[in-house]
């Protein structure tokens, strides 16, 4: 089983409009509300793929109850309740544009943060792989993910970590390393304080920087140009076919689902990389975020090429 961790989930509300009118009333007919957050996108895709998944994280108030109720019944859930209220994230879809209004979310009390560590430690006993995704809520220290990684390492469970900014920097500077990280070029540039291109020789050098020492897998998305990856001392380039992109949002989460599944099933490097890329591409072909149509899985899988570089 795979444990997904979403520390700052949200109720994602979608308001489709023909036109967004400013300083007046906009009436919405077709409203959708879903359990949101990067980790919950990972959860949905793993469930649709057919892997056993347990979802955890922090929820609070009536919105927290709503969120848990709106996670697929096939998914096991064991969230930790806090005093603060789970946030709303609103997307206004008008024409070809999308305007987002994102609430900051609750401030987590220090005691709640400590108690979640104990909660997380108990959940580790029943899972084989951990996937941690998204931002940290206010109130938790910037190195909180390093504490989760430390507990998972002590339990012998591999960790796929998908976060960015100061939270990722804190983990990289910690002695407790995740098994997998998946930064993109922009995030690599931010971490290193210099521009990083998609040139393969440059990426090889970058991923051997001391900052990334001790991390078994580093998987870098190159968008339509596929993926560059480092596993131990071996480098890979994944070439992907052109596809019709409907909605790319959440494709990185689907990639995390594929990586986690590959670790769970102890797949070869090539199998793990292909699965991760295919699930990301399947997500991009769907209107709904964090959703894949498995009927198209094998046809895409057969088109991907992994080469050692």
Curated annotation (Swiss-Prot):
<dbReference type="InterPro" id="IPR017583">
    <property type="entry name" value="Tagatose/fructose_Pkinase"/>
</dbReference>
<dbReference type="InterPro" id="IPR002173">
    <property type="entry name" value="Carboh/pur_kinase_PfkB_CS"/>
</dbReference>
<dbReference type="GO" id="GO:0009024">
    <property type="term" value="F:tagatose-6-phosphate kinase activity"/>
</dbReference>
<dbReference type="GO" id="GO:0008443">
    <property type="term" value="F:phosphofructokinase activity"/>
</dbReference>
<dbReference type="GO" id="GO:2001059">
    <property type="term" value="P:D-tagatose 6-phosphate catabolic process"/>
</dbReference>
<keyword id="KW-0547">Nucleotide-binding</keyword>
<dbReference type="InterPro" id="IPR011611">
    <property type="entry name" value="PfkB_dom"/>
</dbReference>
<dbReference type="Pfam" id="PF00294">
    <property type="entry name" value="PfkB"/>
</dbReference>
<keyword id="KW-0808">Transferase</keyword>
<dbReference type="GO" id="GO:0019512">
    <property type="term" value="P:lactose catabolic process via tagatose-6-phosphate"/>
</dbReference>
<dbReference type="InterPro" id="IPR005926">
    <property type="entry name" value="LacC"/>
</dbReference>
<comment type="pathway">
    <text>Carbohydrate metabolism; D-tagatose 6-phosphate degradation; D-glyceraldehyde 3-phosphate and glycerone phosphate from D-tagatose 6-phosphate: step 1/2.</text>
</comment>
<dbReference type="GO" id="GO:0005829">
    <property type="term" value="C:cytosol"/>
</dbReference>
<protein>
    <recommendedName>
        <fullName>Tagatose-6-phosphate kinase</fullName>
        <ecNumber>2.7.1.144</ecNumber>
    </recommendedName>
</protein>
<comment type="similarity">
    <text>Belongs to the carbohydrate kinase PfkB family. LacC subfamily.</text>
</comment>
<dbReference type="InterPro" id="IPR029056">
    <property type="entry name" value="Ribokinase-like"/>
</dbReference>
<keyword id="KW-0423">Lactose metabolism</keyword>
<dbReference type="GO" id="GO:0005524">
    <property type="term" value="F:ATP binding"/>
</dbReference>
<keyword id="KW-0418">Kinase</keyword>
<keyword id="KW-0067">ATP-binding</keyword>
């Amino acid at each position: 089983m795979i444990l997904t961790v979403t520390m700052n989930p949200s109720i994602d509300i979608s308001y489709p409009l023909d036109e967004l009118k400013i300083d007046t009333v906009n009436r919405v007919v077709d409203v959708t509300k879903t359990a949101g957050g990067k980790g919950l996108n990972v959860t949905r895709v793993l469930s649709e793929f057919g892997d056993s998944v347990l979802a955890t994280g922090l929820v609070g108030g009536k919105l927290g109850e709503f969120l848990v109720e709106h996670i697929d019944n096939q998914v096991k859930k064991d969230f930790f309740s806090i005093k603060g209220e789970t946030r709303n994230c609103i997307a206004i879809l008008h024409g070809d544009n999308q305007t987002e209004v994102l609430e900051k979310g609750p401030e987590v009390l220090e005691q709640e943060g400590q108690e979640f560590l104990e909660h997380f430690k108990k959940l580790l006993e029943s899972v084989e792989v951990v996937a941690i995704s998204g931002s940290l809520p206010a109130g938790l220290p910037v190195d909180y993910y390093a504490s989760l990684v430390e507990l998972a390492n002590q339990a012998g469970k591999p960790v796929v970590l998908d976060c960015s900014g100061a939270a990722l920097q804190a983990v990289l500077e910690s002695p407790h390393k995740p098994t997998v990280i998946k930064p993109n070029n922009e995030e690599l540039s931010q971490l290193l304080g210099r521009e990083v291109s998609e040139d393969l020789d440059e990426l090889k050098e970058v991923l051997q920087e001391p900052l990334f020492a001790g991390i078994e897998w580093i998987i870098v998305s190159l968008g339509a140009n596929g993926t560059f990856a480092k596993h131990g001392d071996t480098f890979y380039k994944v070439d992907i076919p052109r596809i019709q992109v409907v909605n790319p949002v959440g494709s990185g989460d689907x990639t995390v689902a594929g990586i986690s599944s590959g670790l769970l099933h102890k797949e070869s490097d090539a199998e793990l990389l292909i699965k991760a890329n295919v699930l990301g591409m399947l997500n991009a072909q769907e209107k709904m975020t964090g959703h894949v149509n498995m009927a198209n899985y094998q046809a895409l899988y057969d088109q991907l090429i992994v080469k050692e570089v």
